[in-house]
Amino acid sequence: KIGVFGDNCSGKTTFLNLITGQIKPDTGTSVVGENTFFGYYMQNPEFPNTNLTVLEYIKEAAEYIVKNDGKNLSASAFLEEFGFEGKIQYSPVSTLSGGERKRLFLVRLLMSNPNFLILDEPTNDFDIFTMNILEQFLYSYKGCLLIVSHDRYFMDKVADTLFILEADGTISGFV
């Protein structure tokens, strides 16, 4: 579980985009293992079809998720864990607030059950409730985790190793 800090415009998001293959390196190559399945939480997620209901949007990723404790949860039950209870699951995505949409994007990402989770500024726009749920999920997450954030408190809680990406491209690390 690795956390990455850096000043604005130091290349943190570019680094994540290189890892996931969103962009190609100017030189060299980037190789991803054949069993690697990325879950990439971006700062500004896109919703191609906001007419879907919250539940339909999540079910596009999976009907069920097997949590780290072996518990099998339906998409609806997993949504409830993230505060999407009752009628809101049948509301169109277009009716959600910005923070709710980001939370929904996170739930869908986690429902896809990636083995390499990449979070780019995950604490932006999340309320305390969502932050607590995310922290609890990350504590028990068994895959690779790479987080970029300016939130040192959050990083100290969920990352094992922290790196600083300098504007000149150098990396310094500390635990």
Predicted regions and their residues:
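ABC ATP-binding cassette signature C-motif
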Residues: 1-175
